[in-house]
Amino acid sequence: MDLAKYIDHTQLKPDTTKQSIVKIVEEAKQHEFASVCVNPHWVSYCYNELKDTPVKVCTVIGFPLGATSTETKIFETNQAIADGATEVDMVINVGELKSNNDAFVEKDIRAVVEAAKGKALTKVIIETSLLTEDEKVRACKLAKNAEADYVKTSTGFSGGGATVEDIRLMRETVGPEMGVKASGGVRDLEQTEAMIEAGATRIGASSGVAIVSGEQGTSDY
């Protein structure tokens, strides 16, 4: 198993410096990770550094709360793609899901999917740590109905990250055709292999180098 191809090498902390972005870009080149996942501000730099490599540029939309307007999420998506992103990880409106406004949640997701269509993959962050089991299932079904490419567990900003149980539930809910991304607190090889065995097809982690080296990472992201 080529673990590097599963990993979105991630740096989303609010105090991220240019130096730390340069570092993850170089690590991504060296290990040929699936992507680097960075905040929108850094997309253009990462694209210019990675455009001649197999490493994709992934960014986040409506991050980390998901509570921006749909129009804002569309604008962010268009700007990210213009800057060179080919994968976007958008956060659902968790409050509307919990208010049983499923039609709004699906429409919000679909708007980003449509903006990205043909240009970028869309991954939908459902923020599992804030949801009941029923809400997790509903969120996954809404993302699937909206024709997103992936469902993703967590932002890493709301406490709690990916669990094997959640990955298994998400995989069972969306079936074999959608991607499932485990993100938040995945720090080592053992955790990564357990997530993949449970159904994850992508791993979001800032500990990518530690994972592929069989070491223990320290970050929550």
Curated annotation (Swiss-Prot):
Protein EC: 4.1.2.4
Metabolic or biological pathway: Carbohydrate degradation; 2-deoxy-D-ribose 1-phosphate degradation; D-glyceraldehyde 3-phosphate and acetaldehyde from 2-deoxy-alpha-D-ribose 1-phosphate: step 2/2
Subcellular location: Cytoplasm
SMART domains noted in UniProt: DeoC
Pfam families listed in its UniProt record: DeoC
Record-annotated active site: D89, K152, K181
Annotated GO biological process: 2-deoxyribose 1-phosphate catabolic process; carbohydrate catabolic process; deoxyribonucleotide catabolic process
EC top class named in words: lyase
Organism superkingdom: Bacteria
UniProt cross-references to InterPro entries, sorted A to Z: Aldolase_TIM, DeoC, DeoC/FbaB/LacD_aldolase, DeoC_typeI
An example Gene Ontology molecular-function term: deoxyribose-phosphate aldolase activity
CDD domains tied to this protein: DeoC
Catalytic activity reported: 2-deoxy-D-ribose 5-phosphate = D-glyceraldehyde 3-phosphate + acetaldehyde
Main subcellular location of this protein, as a coarse class: cytoplasm
Keywords: Cytoplasm, Lyase, Schiff base
One GO CC term on file: cytoplasm
NCBIfam families: deoC
UniProt family annotation: Belongs to the DeoC/FbaB aldolase family. DeoC type 1 subfamily.
Role, per record: Catalyzes a reversible aldol reaction between acetaldehyde and D-glyceraldehyde 3-phosphate to generate 2-deoxy-D-ribose 5-phosphate.
PANTHER family: DEOXYRIBOSE-PHOSPHATE ALDOLASE
Protein name, UniProt field: Deoxyribose-phosphate aldolase 1
